[in-house]
């Protein structure tokens, strides 16, 4: 029975958040409590940036991860988990509604996909969090060497 539950969990984990919760309930799977979605943000969803309102009720913690952040020429960055740059961001702890809103904003799954990464919290500690990764980097995407979207936008990085 335990194997069957694990198989079902794997089959529904890639559904959008609200559909996943509904499927978990209908299948009788253990449901994670609301507000347990950790998401690493590195661009316009950061505190004070243009799209922060999409997750205004999420708890925010300063954090970093390794990878590569790109300027793609359209007012928002892209992230690739491959790379060794210290990428500055925040880990948001979001409820189902905020998580679904972020999925819509990011064009999940058409424009961006979600991947789990390891994030390091300011002040210590490490968490696993989702990150939005662009499915295909546009031609001309340029790595942001400083790894910090805000500094890059201000011309400091």
Each predicted region: which residue ranges?
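Glycine-aromatic micro-motifs
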Residues: 2-157
């Amino acid at each position: 029975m335990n194997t069957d539950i694990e198989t079902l969990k794997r089959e529904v984990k890639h559904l959008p958040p609200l559909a996943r919760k509904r499927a978990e309930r209908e299948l009788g799977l253990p449901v994670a409590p609301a507000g347990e979605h950790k998401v690493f943000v590195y661009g316009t969803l950061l505190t004070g940036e243009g799209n922060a309102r999409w997750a205004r009720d999420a708890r925010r913690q300063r954090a970093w991860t390794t990878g590569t952040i790109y300027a793609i020429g359209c007012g928002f960055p892209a992230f690739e988990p491959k790379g060794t740059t210290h990428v500055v961001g925040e880990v948001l702890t979001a409820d189902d509604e905020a998580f679904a809103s972020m999925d819509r904003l990011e064009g999940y799954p058409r424009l961006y996909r979600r991947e789990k990464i390891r994030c390091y919290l300011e002040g210590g500690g490490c968490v696993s969090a989702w990150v939005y990764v662009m499915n295909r980097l546009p031609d001309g995407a340029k790595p942001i060497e400083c790894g910090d979207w805000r500094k890059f936008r201000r011309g400091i990085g």
